[in-house]
Amino acid sequence: MSDTSLTHCSEVLLTARNLCADRGGRRVLEGIDLSIGAGEVVTIIGPNGAGKSTLLKVLLGVEPYSEGQVIRKANLCVGYVPQRMPVDAILPMTVQRMLRLAKEVDETAMLAVLEETGVAHVLHAPLQGLSGGEFQRVLLARAMLRNPQLLVLDEPVQGVDYSGEVALYQLIGALRKRHGCGVLLVSHDLHMVMRDTDRVVCLNRHICCTGTPDHVSGHPEFARLFGDQALQTLALYQHHHHSCTHHMPVDVAIDPQEQA
């Protein structure tokens, strides 16, 4: 099963071809074919242990793969929001200081992106004192500071309450529309993300099924992995699908702690 569905008007940002990865003598990714275009939202779903986070890190170039190809647009700039980022309680750090760790940070741009993500009020606050929603928005602001062509998010609503989840997904959608960046998202929140997703990739070490939410909702592999209740939830959403290579290193900054 491959996922290379792009509309003719979409510039390809990143492509995986027959991608395989092994960890500890075990194959964790098998024959992945995947492309994402400019302005497109692609959501990767799958059970625990399906290889979702591994796939993201392989695509970003921070973990190795065993076979296949990863092809990125020349000079592709990526903003990355990790699944988790440990905060050292012994060494307090403010939001401003963390954002200043990025290369060539412009103070005006920093304030603007914090305003855009709704957390300008925490500029001088310690990271340890932020709520779950505030912390995720700060990580999103850090990613957007790079003016990315591709925004990659690994379970971005962890530690966020229900109302915060809704608001955060709405913010991600607004950033995509405003900046025109592609979005590659890993999520378990089927009832949240499917409404605004262009394509769904159902992963369980290999791509089980892929396509629009409407297409995936009718696929037997989706029902087998997630059950009839999830299928019915996904089918509730009406979807409107909208919508060419260089081997180059990706321009993405990921802290060593985030790769653990």
From Swiss-Prot:
ABC transporter domain location: 14-229
Q: Name one Pfam family in it.
A: ABC_tran
- What is catalyzed by this enzyme? Zn(2+)(out) + ATP(in) + H2O(in) = Zn(2+)(in) + ADP(in) + phosphate(in) + H(+)(in)
Per the record, the gene is znuC
The alphabetical list of record keywords is:
ATP-binding, Cell inner membrane, Cell membrane, Ion transport, Membrane, Nucleotide-binding, Translocase, Transport, Zinc, Zinc transport
The UniProt record lists the keyword Ribonucleoprotein: no
Q: Which domain of life is it from?
A: Bacteria
List the EC numbers from the record: 7.2.2.20
One GO process term, biological-process aspect: response to zinc ion
List, alphabetically, the GO terms of the cellular component aspect: plasma membrane
The UniProt annotation places ATP binding at G46, P47, N48, G49, A50, G51, K52, S53
Subunit structure, per the record? The complex is composed of two ATP-binding proteins (ZnuC), two transmembrane proteins (ZnuB) and a solute-binding protein (ZnuA).
Which protein family is named in the record? Belongs to the ABC transporter superfamily. Zinc importer (TC 3.A.1.15.5) family.
Q: What is its main location?
A: membrane
Q: Name one GO molecular function term.
A: ATP binding
Its membrane topology: Peripheral membrane protein
Q: Which residues form a coiled coil?
A: none
- Name of the protein in question: Zinc import ATP-binding protein ZnuC
Its biological function?
A: Part of the ABC transporter complex ZnuABC involved in zinc import. Responsible for energy coupling to the transport system.
- Class in the EC hierarchy, top level: translocase
Give compartment(s).
Cell inner membrane
